[in-house]
Regions:
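Glycine-rich phosphate-binding active-site loops on the catalytic face of alpha/beta enzymes
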Residues: 83, 91-115
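Glycine-enriched alpha-helix->loop->beta-strand junction motifs that scaffold or abut catalytic
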Residues: 43, 73-75, 91-100, 119
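Broad structural signal for hydrophobic residues in well-ordered alpha-helices, predominantly aliphatic
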Residues: 69, 116-119
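Conserved phosphate/oxyanion-binding catalytic-loop motifs
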Residues: 79
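Conserved N-terminal beta1-alpha1 strand-loop-helix module at the mouth
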Residues: 1-75, 83-87
Length: 119
C-alpha cells in the first residue's frame, strides 16, 4: 500500500498566499514562507505553491520566492503556474524547487521531452 501523505496547496498571487472559492472573493492570508513553515511544523509531508495568476497575466515566475522557500522550509515542495518553457522549469528547479507542476499539454510535451532523458 502506498504511504498516505499530507500535501497542503497554497495559492499565490502577487507574492502572497491567498484563499478564495472558485477564485472569487480572494483574500490575502499571509506570507507563503511563514505559512509553509507552519504547515511543515504541523507535519505536512510536502507543499505545493501555485501562482494562480502567472499564466493569465503572462508574467514571469516568482523565482525569488522559490529561493526564500528553499532556504526556510525543510520538506519537498512543488511550484506551479506560468511554466511555459524549458527555461522556466530549469530556473525554478535551480532556485530550489523539488518539483514543478505544469497544466497545459503544450508545456508538458515541451518540458517532458527535454527532461525525459534524465529519468
Amino acid at each position: 500500500m502506498l504511504a498516505k501523505r499530507i500535501i497542503p496547496c497554497l495559492d499565490i498571487r502577487d507574492g502572497q498566499t491567498v484563499k478564495g472559492i472558485n477564485f472569487l472573493n480572494i483574500k490575502n492570508v499571509g506570507d507563503p514562507v511563514e505559512l509553509g513553515a507552519e504547515y511543515s511544523n504541523q507535519g505536512a509531508d510536502e507543499l505545493v505553491y501555485l501562482d494562480i495568476t502567472a499564466s493569465h497575466e503572462e508574467r514571469k515566475l516568482f523565482v525569488n520566492l522559490v529561493k526564500r522557500i528553499a532556504q526556510n522550509i525543510n520538506i519537498p515542495f512543488t511550484i506551479g503556474g506560468g511554466i511555459n518553457e524549458i527555461s522556466d522549469a530549469e530556473r525554478l528547479l535551480n532556485a530550489g524547487a523539488d518539483k514543478i507542476s505544469i497544466n497545459s499539454a503544450s508545456s508538458f510535451y515541451s518540458i517532458y521531452g527535454f527532461f525525459a532523458w534524465k529519468i
